């Protein structure tokens, strides 16, 4: 019975998250999706730690559905890989805390070249 309860708990949590998304999605959601759909460059995902794993999966999913994308590890980015990002790209930075220094340190460069 323990496995069934776990499945019910996890499924309930996921359903609640979807309900929350439906309730809270607004103009920001529409704007973000529109930017990605109309991107003339690549969609680049960036993160460190567990956020890096999520970014890799997102990049692979986007690429498999026809959206040019790739992942850049934020630590590697600040040590030379930022040159892969172009002004026509959209860069999605992923951080659980929002304060990961490696990720935060990339923001200035990304803005300077005009990437969104």
Model regions and ranges:
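An N-terminal, well-structured beta->alpha segment
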Residues: 2-41
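Glycine-rich phosphate-binding loops that contact phosphosugars or nucleotide phosphates
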Residues: 37, 42-48, 52-116
């Amino acid at each position: 019975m323990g496995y069934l309860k776990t499945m019910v708990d996890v499924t309930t949590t996921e359903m609640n998250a979807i309900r929350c998304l439906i309730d809270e999605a607004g103009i920001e959601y529409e704007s973000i999706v529109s930017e990605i759909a109309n991107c003339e460059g690549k969609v680049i995902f960036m993160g460190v730690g567990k956020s890096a794993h999520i970014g890799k999966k997102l990049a692979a999913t986007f690429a498999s559905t026809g959206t040019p994308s790739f992942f850049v590890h934020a630590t590697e980015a600040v040590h030379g890989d930022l040159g892969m990002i172009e002004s026509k790209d959209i860069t999605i930075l992923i951080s659980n805390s929002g304060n990961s220094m490696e990720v935060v340190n990339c923001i200035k460069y990304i803005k300077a070249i005009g990437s969104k």
